[in-house]
Amino acid sequence: TGKLLFPKEAVLDWINKDSIITGKGQLTITGSHDPLLEAVLRQTSIDIATMWNGSSAGLERVASGKASAAVIHIFCPAFRSWNIEPVKTTCADKDVVLLHWAKRSRGLVMKPFVALHVSSLSAIRPYRLSQRQKGAGAQILFEHLLDEASIRTEQLELTATCHTELESVLALLEGKADIAFGLEHYATKYN
């Protein structure tokens, strides 16, 4: 599930003053690529910069003061929960607010001929698989699911390393991969 991470002071200022978040320099949203947020931002007249660099990198940028907000969806296997523990750890001394933004529907996105042969995660081994960059929420979750299925990444043919949800699915259309761990939104859009 995706979350947006904002500095608490900025949220309270926005609520109390009925204004947009302001601060030093450019308002920047970083972290996980979120197609819904991207569409919403395109419809606004607010000057907001985006940097889709993955959940973990986005969280680090907020913690270091280099970003105004981060879109994150980081599964924490030890707690079987999303986002809270990584935020507590990374932003322990920061004044931040964690807001629920949206739920993501994700799974294996496959070329049609592959879908005929893959009915479980264990059946992906012979196929080329696009992957997300280290620290991306999707990659963290996928590696957890592989671990639960007793599959090591060394057993897979990993091809393209993709930096956005869209890139991950486009790798299939471009012939770089047969399977991606991606969003239902893009699977439906590019089917």
Give, region by region, the residue ranges found by the protein language model:
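Short, intrinsically disordered, charge-balanced linker/junction segments flanking boundaries
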Residues: 1, 123, 187-191
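N-terminal hydrophobic or amphipathic helices and topogenic motifs
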Residues: 1-66, 82-85, 89-96, 115-118, ...
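Short, well-ordered beta-strand segments
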Residues: 28-31, 130, 180
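Ligand-binding cleft/hinge of the Venus flytrap
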Residues: 39-45, 121, 132, 138-160
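Short helices/loops that flank or line small-molecule/ion binding pockets
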Residues: 56-68, 74-75, 161-176
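A ligand-binding cleft/hinge motif common to bilobed small-molecule-binding domains
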Residues: 73-89, 169-191
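Short Pro/Gly-enriched coil loops immediately N-terminal to beta-strands
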Residues: 90-109, 124-125
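Flexible hinge/capping segments at coil-to-helix
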Residues: 110-129
